[in-house]
Regions:
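Acidic-residue sensor for enzyme active/binding pockets
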Residues: 32, 84-85
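Auxiliary Fe-S-binding modules of radical SAM enzymes
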Residues: 1-24
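Intrinsically disordered, low-complexity segments enriched in proline/serine/threonine
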Residues: 7-9, 45, 88
Length: 169
């Protein structure tokens, strides 16, 4: 017998999108920097390496935690951590551990280009990250180099995928 779904008693209190659907997912950018220069996202000829921003302009971990806690209070249950490349954010596993400890946040995911994942996959998993999305445009090494602005290698991403699998993702 199939279980009968029960409506969320607080659904009427939730913020809604333009189509009236409750907002339960939050996408949060934790850094405005990337180690690649993909032509569709941040071409080297138009985006400086520092993006015109410095570390002082980023939200602190305390500010991020307070912000996410507020969204959880109004019904957000899923968090996707992004950035240009979120793995460039120093001490990211520490931030994820803080967010994973928030009551009511059921899922934390991260989108990455995967090039820095080999060194961080285990720490991210142990911190409480549930899921990963790795953006991979091609499995051709030369095509990959061209798409990343020659700032990344396919081998780095593949090592990151292996490390993620070994870490339990």
């Amino acid at each position: 017998m199939n279980a009968v779904p029960h409506p969320d008693p607080h659904a009427d209190d939730l913020p809604r999108d333009a189509l009236g659907r409750p907002l339960r997912d939050l996408r949060l950018s934790v850094i405005e920097a990337c180690n690649f220069r993909c032509p569709y996202c941040m071409p080297a000829d138009r985006v400086p390496d520092d993006h015109g921003l410095d570390a002082a302009s980023r939200l602190s971990f305390d500010q991020i935690e307070r912000l996410v806690r507020g969204f959880v209070r109004v019904g957000v249950r899923k968090l996707r951590i992004t950035g240009e490349e979120p793995l460039l954010r120093k001490r990211l596993p520490e931030l994820i551990a803080r967010l994973a400890a928030l009551d009511g946040l059921d899922d934390i995911a991260l989108t990455t280009n995967g090039s820095l994942l080999a060194a961080q996959a285990r720490a991210l998993r142990e911190a409480g990250l549930h899921r990963l999305t790795v953006s991979l445009d091609t499995l051709d090494p030369e095509g990959f180099a061209a798409l990343s602005g020659r700032r990344g290698t396919l081998d780095d991403v593949l090592r990151g995928l292996d490390a993620a699998r070994e870490a339990g993702f």
